[in-house]
């Protein structure tokens, strides 16, 4: 019998609360672990502090998200090459299986030119998997407003339409020919990408899922799974029925929650969705 797929909670899912809140929710609700989003919060950058939280709440760190967002360009320095190296070291120190990283930005030329080789070298020297995540372009239809942009995507049958990609070689990590990938279901919604097809194309290289949802808006939504238009249940069922040996992490936005109870309800609903559709 294949082992159950572990389900984690991203520390980004409790924003604007701090990382400790994610450990607390994960413990209380029954998540199997957390994904550490390294960004502006000082604790997220302090591996010793994160290790203490993990021990205090008895919640392991399953994965580390490298500080590669636009808002975290100065976290752990300004050199993205060194930041990725440090992310892998952090994962090793925390006992995490995976580092999630975005494709390089186009203006990070030196980093972009050596990215594939760096990822391969890091994996060759470590047991940590570096899973490159699918992203999305800047869509021109965002200027038409939410309703119209969603309808335009529906009418064209998916795809971003006229758009500009900030990523090299593209926002599709499969263009980089890496060994391991992260599939994010909010990003597929924003890009108009067929997420089931992308999961199949990633094949055994798919080792990490950001379980969330989206409705086709040009902005990244990170909805609770089941509240958007993505085939979230089908993707989970595909993984459950396969030889998937990675982790599934809920990376959902709860910043709209009007109370602590509402945030907890969103996180509990997300976990229940995952448990239901990942059952083996």
UniProtKB/Swiss-Prot annotation:
Transmembrane region(s): none
Keyword annotations from UniProtKB, A to Z: Signal
Keyword Heme: no
Family annotation (Gene3D superfamilies): Divalent-metal-dependent TIM barrel enzymes (3.20.20.150)
Signal peptide, first to last residue: 1-21
Keyword Protein biosynthesis: no
Family classification: To M.leprae ML2432 and S.coelicolor SCO3347.
Protein name in UniProt: Uncharacterized protein Mb0509
């Amino acid at each position: 019998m294949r082992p159950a797929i572990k389900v984690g909670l991203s520390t980004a899912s409790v924003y604007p609360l701090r990382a400790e809140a994610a450990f607390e929710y994960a413990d209380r609700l029954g998540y199997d672990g957390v994904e550490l989003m390294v960004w502006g919060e000082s604790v997220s950058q302090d591996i010793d502090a994160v290790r203490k939280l993990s021990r205090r709440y008895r919640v392991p760190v399953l994965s580390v998200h490298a500080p590669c967002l636009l808002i975290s360009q100065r976290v752990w320095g300004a050199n993205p090459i060194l930041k990725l190296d440090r992310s892998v070291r952090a994962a090793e120190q925390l006992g995490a299986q995976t580092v999630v990283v975005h494709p390089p930005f186009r203006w990070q030329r030196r980093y972009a030119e050596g990215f594939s080789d760096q990822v391969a070298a890091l994996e060759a020297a470590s047991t940590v998997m570096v899973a490159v995540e699918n992203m999305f372009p800047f869509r021109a239809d965002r200027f038409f407003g939410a309703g119209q942009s969603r309808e335009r995507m529906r009418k064209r049958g998916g795809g971003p339409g006229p758009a500009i990609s900030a990523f090299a070689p593209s926002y599709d990590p499969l263009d980089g020919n890496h060994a391991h990938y992260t599939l994010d279901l909010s990003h597929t919604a924003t890009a108009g990408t067929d997420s089931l097809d992308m999961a199949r194309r990633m094949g055994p290289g798919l080792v990490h899922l950001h379980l969330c949802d989206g409705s086709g808006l040009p902005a990244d939504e990170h909805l609770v799974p089941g509240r958007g238009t993505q085939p979230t249940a089908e993707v989970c069922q595909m993984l459950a029925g396969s030889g998937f040996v990675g982790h599934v992490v809920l990376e959902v936005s709860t910043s709209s929650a009007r109370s602590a109870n509402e945030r907890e309800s969103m996180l509990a609903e997300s976990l229940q969705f995952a448990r239901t559709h990942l059952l083996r």
